[in-house]
Amino acid sequence: MKTSHYLTQRNKKQTGCKMEIIQEKVNDVAIVEIKGRLDVTTASDLEQVFTKLLSENQNKVLVECRELEYISSAGLRVLLNAAKQYNKVSGQIMLAGLSQNVKQVFEISGFTSIFPIYATRDEALKAF
């Protein structure tokens, strides 16, 4: 059973009842799990998470979206800005577990060419 190395840190940040951000660390990968709605009222919270991770020299980030119900253009903008910042430091952001609706937003907006997207967390972790 390989559970001991999976969870070394777990932080929760709840923004009302619209979005919850859960942070974990698996080996050298920061996992940012987003639950709920990522929109103009919650996007700055996710932006703060990325800023903090960058300041800690955390260059590998997996954004787990299996419980992300909705993403607006403000949420897409935060992800795009984070991708640009990570590219500057030779870091990488990957996404995993997009629902069909969220994946469709990524496809329509062209974001599937910006981010590596995996069906599951485990697939993404193996790709780092």
Labelled PLM ranges:
Residues 2-33:
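Short beta-strand/loop segment at the start of cytosolic alpha/beta domains
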